[in-house]
């Protein structure tokens, strides 16, 4: 057991990424995708900082507003916090998996679960839709201070729900590592937070709309420094010469 622990920690620190197959059921992910889309149809796009009492909300981040973020992005994000009433019953099944990953990161398995923004670090679940053609996330490094690993769940599949593009990791020499072909709905990926990664546009020939549920969906689970913290720790973009990972509009 000790040798396995040393081996996996060394591997993750060394920049290896792991695709954990079937971590969530396919039905759970597809159902969550549909429920999130329906739930937010009647609610306006809003924005709230991670401050005490912040509600759950969803926000359309178009190409223009996405330039104001730590790294450039275009997406439709749905944010859920554990201190609210969990309207879609997502925290139970997510925490079942997240606790294992937190333990792997050297945290208590229930670290941050009871925290609210005044405590400094908070858990946040984000369901993300990248619309066709314009949806993307530029190459970047995630914040690593409070969560050592990327922890992403996949809610759609390339070749079925969308064509081309999607998630990529970056190897030395600015070489993109293509893993989308190996991803199935319900899988999760873990890698050290400072491994460069991003999301390339999908369905480049398709006209995007914010009302539809097409495109690429994924589930993000992250422990963030809240906006109650001054000089909060954030991720940062990286300028890499990789072709085909930005929208044509860029």
Language-model region placement:
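Structured loops at beta-to-helix junctions and adjacent beta-edge loops in soluble globular domains
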Residues: 23, 83, 128-131, 154, ...
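Catalytic core of Fe(II)/2-oxoglutarate
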Residues: 158-250
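Glycine-rich, often proline-containing surface loops adjacent to acidic residues and nearby aromatics
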Residues: 11-19, 69-84, 163-166
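N-terminal auxiliary "cap/dimerization" subdomain that precedes the catalytic jelly-roll/cupin core
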Residues: 1-67
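Signature of the catalytic double-stranded beta-helix
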Residues: 24, 61-124
């Amino acid at each position: 057991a000790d040798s396995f622990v040393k081996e996996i920690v060394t591997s993750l620190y060394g920049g290896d990424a792991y695709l954990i197959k079937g971590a969530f059921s396919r039905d759970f992910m597809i159902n969550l995708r549909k429920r999130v889309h329906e739930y937010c149809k009647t609610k306006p796009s809003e924005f709230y900082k991670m401050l005490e009492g912040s509600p759950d909300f969803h926000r359309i981040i178009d190409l223009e507003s996405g330039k104001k973020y730590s790294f450039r992005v275009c997406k439709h994000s749905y944010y859920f916090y554990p201190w609210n009433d969990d309207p879609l019953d997502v925290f139970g099944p997510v925490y079942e998996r997240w606790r294992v990953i937190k333990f792997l990161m050297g945290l208590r398995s229930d670290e941050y679960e009871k925290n609210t923004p005044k405590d400094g670090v908070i858990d946040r679940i984000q369901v993300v839709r990248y619309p066709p053609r314009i949806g993307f996330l530029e190459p970047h490094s995630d914040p690593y201070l409070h969560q050592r690993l990327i922890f992403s769940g996949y809610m759609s599949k390339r070749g079925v729900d969308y064509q081309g593009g999607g998630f990529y990791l970056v190897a030395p020499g600015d070489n993109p590592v293509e893993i989308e072909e190996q991803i199935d709905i319900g899988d999760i990926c873990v890698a050290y937070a400072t491994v460069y990664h991003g999301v390339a546009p999908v369905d480049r020939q398709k006209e995007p709309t914010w009302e539809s549920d097409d495109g690429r969906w994924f589930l993000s689970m992250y422990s963030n420094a809240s906006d109650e913290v001054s000089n909060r720790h954030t991720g940062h973009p990286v300028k890499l010469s990789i072709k085909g990972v930005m929208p044509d509009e860029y």
